[in-house]
Amino acid sequence: MVIHLPDDEHIINDLGIQRLENIIHLAEDKNIQVTFENLNNICNLNRVLSTFESKNVGYCYDSCHHVNYAPDDDLIKRYGNRLMALHLQDNVGKHNQHQLPFDGSIAWAQVMKKIAHSGYQGTTSLEPMNWDYEHLSIQQFLDLAYQRAKKLDELRTIEFV
């Protein structure tokens, strides 16, 4: 499960923490992972990840949100030991473009190296939208996305060859 916390203009309060605690206890009972995604919410993300140390609680890295909201903060280094999910997509730093990887300005070799060094063993998950790809058929878009995911996986594993 991936949860979006409030942005840092709306600092999470004790009631919010209590509600998350209830969700996390239920998730632990059912062995469900609860991850918190980086948005414009790094203070809230810090609070939640430092409050809940359960093995079922972790971090969902979103590459587009990283570039847009915290480009100077090494989020993978900071939370890599808690990394449980990836939302990978590209942009040029303007807004949440959700482009396919390698169509924007993200330095994918560096990102995937950091992910590899974090010890993350999960899937390489893309989160693109077809806004910039309306000229492609659905099948062409999916084929291209699959090729890009494979390329990211290659970058992730090249570190250990």
Regions found by a protein language model. Give the residues of each.
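Histidine-acidic metal/acid-base catalytic patches
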Residues: I42-V161
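Active-site acidic/histidine proton-transfer and metal-coordination neighborhood
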Residues: M1-G58, N68
